[in-house]
Amino acid sequence: MSIRNYSRRDVLKFSAAGVAVGTLGACATSAGAKGKVVVVGGGWGGSTTAKYLRLWSDGGIDVTLIEPNTSFVSCPISNLVIGGSRRIEQLTTNYDGLRRHGVNVVHDTVTAIDPDKRLVRLASGQTLPFDRAVVSPGIEFMFEQVKGMSPA
């Protein structure tokens, strides 16, 4: 038996896959109606989850990804930009790949999630119903929370 070292990318894929698989069964509905999953956040976690929920359900789940930004910058390889090996444009992509997989991409900001009514409210005033919601907004540094720390 050999031991394999897993990369951070492998761990992320396995984590997203676990979330996706756990959500698939929960979205099953009667009479052939499609389940609805709303994914909040279009970073690595949210985008991967949205893609694989759609793929693994063979189109049986309506997946909507909500992300305010129209493009995604791959931060894990951003050191290549700092080092001059790449330009930021080479690490930036839009969400068309998810759309090709059947994911509905909405560029807006979530203002509230009502778990009782199963609704997501957007800054535009639109509400989206869901059977399951995946919240993956990414990180936000709160420098002011650490004494002596400030943004560069």
Segments and roles (model prediction):
Residues 137-152:
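Glycine-rich dinucleotide-binding loop and its adjacent helix/turn
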Residues 126-132:
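Core beta-strand elements of the Rossmann-like FAD/NAD(P) dinucleotide-binding domain
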Residues 29-104, 148-149:
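Beta1-alpha1 glycine-rich phosphate/pyrophosphate-binding loop at the start
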Residues 122, 135-136:
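Redox-cofactor binding/interface segments in oxidoreductases and associated redox assembly factors
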Residues 108-116:
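A conserved short coil-to-beta-strand element within the FAD-binding core of flavoproteins
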